[in-house]
Swiss-Prot record:
It comes from the Bacteria. GO terms for cellular component: cytosol. This is UPF0434 protein NMC0623. Belongs to the UPF0434 family. The lineage of its organism: Bacteria, Pseudomonadati, Pseudomonadota, Betaproteobacteria, Neisseriales. InterPro entries: Trm112-like. SUPFAM superfamilies: Trm112p-like (SSF158997).
Amino acid sequence: MEKKFLDILVCPVTKGRLEYHQDKQELWSRQAKLAYPIKDGIPYMLENEARPLGEEELEA
């Protein structure tokens, strides 16, 4: 994912910064504790599409 694109995207819940995790193809919002999936290069930025982040993931 291009950095300039990532700079524009924000978490739809918190409006905060997102982290790109290439290995999992996800965008993480640490504030909302949610991981938004990226499918075929398209980020799905809907709260109901996100999975909750576990405490172990947040501490890493």
